[in-house]
Regions:
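Enzymes that bind and transform nitrogen-containing heteroaromatic metabolites
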Residues: 2-165
Length: 165
């Protein structure tokens, strides 16, 4: 029997919950991406297939990647560990070092899956101040009642540490 390990969520969203448009970020804030890179560097990242396909391959050189996909065989030639279900995911993370940080990085379907099943211990959410159009959302209602701590703020965004109470 193993203890269920929870992930740390890390994503950016507008106040309306927009996280992507056409499998890409609708904004360009290099400092915010640097924060993502430095926070997740050297750790395990979890994502859905669309997020995986949108990321540059170089990101996987310093991170272990677990990718949810309905058809993992299609992606086997690429770097990463591919899973079809939460059960397969639990098996994989049970084999990781107990001190290994695990970050759930999106997209929308995976974020909602992890939040619905309470698989997130805390969430680093960058709130983008400007409105953008998009086609992928993060339902920010999931964070109602979570404690917010401001990590950084500037004119373009605020980085929050959200803790589930």
């Amino acid at each position: 029997m193993f203890k269920l390990r929870k992930a740390i969520g890390i994503m950016a969203a507008t106040n309306e919950g927009i996280i992507a448009k056409g499998n890409a970020l609708p904004w360009n804030y290099p400092e915010e991406l640097d924060h993502f890179r430095s926070t997740t560097d050297g750790h395990t990242i979890i994502m859905g297939r669309k997020t995986y396909e949108a990321l540059p391959e170089g990101i996987f050189s310093s991170r272990k990647a677990i990718i949810f996909s309905k058809n993992p065989k299609e992606l086997e030639a690429k770097p990463g560990i591919f899973v079809k279900s939460l059960e397969e995911y639990f098996y994989i993370i049970n084999g990781l070092d107990k001190d290994e940080k695990i970050f759930m990085i999106g997209g929308g379907k995976i974020a909602h899956l992890f939040l619905k099943h309470q698989l997130i211990s805390s969430f680093i959410l960058t709130r983008i101040h400007r409105s953008y159009s998009g086609d992928t959302y993060l339902d920010l209602k999931h964070f109602k009642g979570w404690r917010e701590t401001v990590l950084k703020t500037n004119s373009n965004y605020t980085i929050l540490q959200l803790t589930n109470m």
